[in-house]
């Protein structure tokens, strides 16, 4: 399993999500585990323009954004929000 960091803003969102929507919280937790254990990071879509160093994964109508440092094999989970709001 890769090393990872969940940024403070995302951590707050996940704590709030756990209280409000337990099912979605479990889906996010499972998706984070999937990202950490996958062999080919190229499987996840790269973002473009200002967010070009990030990758994304969809969870229903929500998006989890993360950055992968290939040299250190380290993942930074950055943000999670509805797909209409995440890129603004």
Give, region by region, the residue ranges found by the protein language model.
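A broad, structural micro-motif
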Residues: 4-5, 42
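A short, surface-exposed loop/turn module that caps and links secondary-structure elements
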Residues: 33-56
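Enriched for short, Lys/Arg-rich terminal
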Residues: 1-4, 15, 19-26, 59-63, ...
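Alpha-helix N-cap/helix-start and coil->helix boundary motif
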Residues: 11, 41, 83-84
């Amino acid at each position: 399993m890769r090393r990872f960091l969940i940024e403070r803003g995302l951590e707050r969102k996940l704590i709030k999500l756990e209280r409000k929507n337990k099912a979605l919280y479990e889906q996010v937790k499972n998706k984070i585990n999937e990202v950490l254990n996958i062999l080919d990071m190229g499987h996840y879509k790269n973002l473009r323009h200002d967010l070009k160093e990030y990758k994304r994964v969809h969870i229903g109508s929500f998006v989890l954004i993360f950055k992968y440092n290939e040299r250190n094999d380290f993942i930074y989970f950055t943000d999670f929000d509805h797909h209409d709001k995440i890129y603004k």
